[in-house]
């Protein structure tokens, strides 16, 4: 089966919720890792630092700063060896965190429903898997860029974006030159 972004999007939008509800485990595990980092001293402590009073004056107290805090916090905890599980994507814990927490934080802070969260997380994670399989074994494209692309798709959809806007999010996040078409000039077909 040739996987396309359209197939990923359609799957995330139309699959019965009970069949994909398991994706909430990624949110629970990765958020718990972030929260653990806020309580301890892990790695560079960036997630914890971004929550401080001084940093709020620099970064602000916004959805964006919260996304940065949770995502970097969970990565700090993971990389510093905290005894806490995280959910990976394509074999990488940091990619799993980066495909999950931006979408989760955005959904929570904007009052999105559980169904919307499930579908956005599924879109994010499957987009990462789709892009990774399109890139092949070796790529000059960093895995965290790929994970951020997945998150951008999930957040775009949560903002009311259509399939076309989700596809534009991919193109804006990943240079078009990194992915090649199977039979057309666009990998998004």
Write out the residue ranges for each language-model feature.
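Alpha-helical support elements that line or immediately flank enzyme active sites
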Residues: 96-112, 152-160
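Signature of multi-pass transmembrane helix bundles
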Residues: 1-81
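Conserved phosphate/anionic-ligand binding catalytic regions in large, soluble enzymes, centered on
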Residues: 86-100, 144-146
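Acidic-glycine-rich active-site phosphate/pyrophosphate-binding loop
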Residues: 62-81, 114-131, 175
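Flexible glycine/proline-rich, aromatic-decorated loop/lid segments
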Residues: 166-176
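Phosphate/pyrophosphate-binding betaalpha-module
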Residues: 113-126, 130, 134-147, 162-168
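Conserved small/polar residues in nucleotide/adenosyl-binding loops
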Residues: 177-185
